[in-house]
Design a protein with these regions (language model features):
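Class I SAM-dependent methyltransferase SAM/SAH-binding core
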Residues: 79, 84-114, 119-124
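Class I SAM-dependent methyltransferase "Motif I" SAM/SAH-binding loop
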Residues: 74-78
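A short glycine-rich, Lys/Arg-flanked "PGG" loop and its adjoining helix->strand segment in the class I
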Residues: 148-162
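Short conserved loop adjoining the S-adenosyl-L-methionine
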Residues: 125-130
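Short alpha-helix
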Residues: 188-196
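Conserved class I S-adenosyl-L-methionine
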Residues: 1-65, 163-187
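A short SAM/SAH-binding and catalytic strip from SAM-dependent methyltransferases
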Residues: 134-146
Length: 196
């Protein structure tokens, strides 16, 4: 790539995709909270297999950087949270859903983790009282209208390391079959290239 090659404005592209989403969850905090309340009420703590793979890669990195404190935003059902609690002296979670926070804290207590804290807030509105060795967000960026600000917040809040990740699902075989017959399908509307 030449210096004169213009890079796309990832933040503008990302914001346009978030704004164009037909899902009311993207734009209405009450609907998002209701979704998580319903989802968490049926959930049992069990980390996803993909989280195991990510953590196998991250554990040595976290040890190498001597991570003792972590802040995770958007913990979902805690696929990463309790592993972070096992590795760190303290883990703080930030989420707009109190139901999510209660679920993660309960799962932690059931596994005798006493080093978890929770902050009921949207990441965009959260004002941390201190910094953390690690700021961690995984699969939680879907509502971030200003991704550049989100990443800048992570950087300001981290002393040593930021981890921002997003799983990219494997395309189902029927999607290619649809394309082969001329059908239109929008599977990957947030291109991870703009996220990296």
């Amino acid at each position: 790539m030449n210096e004169s090659d213009a890079l796309p404005d990832f933040n503008r592209i990302w914001a346009a995709r978030v704004a164009a989403s037909p899902s009311p969850r993207m734009h209405d905090d009450g609907i998002e909270r209701a979704f998580w309340r319903d989802f968490i009420s049926r959930k049992v703590y069990k980390p996803e297999s993909s989280a195991r793979q990510v953590l196998a890669y991250l554990r040595p990195l976290l040890r190498e950087h001597q991570i003792e404190t972590a802040l995770e935003f958007g913990p979902g059902w805690g696929s990463y949270t309790l592993d972070l609690a096992a590795l760190c002296r303290e883990v703080a979670c930030v989420d707009l859903s109190q139901d999510v926070l209660d679920f993660v804290l309960r799962a932690g207590r059931e596994r005798v983790f006493c080093n978890l804290r929770a902050f009921h807030s949207k990441w965009e509105d959260f004002s941390p009282e201190r910094t953390y060795d690690l700021v961690f967000g995984y699969n939680c960026f879907y509502r971030q209208g200003d991704l550049a600000d989100c990443l800048a917040r992570m950087t300001r809040t981290a002393n040593k390391l930021c981890v921002a990740g997003m799983n990219v699902a494997v395309l189902p075989p029927w999607l290619q079959e649809m394309k082969d017959v001329g059908a239109s399908a929008n599977w990957d509307w947030k291109d991870p290239v703009y996220f990296v």
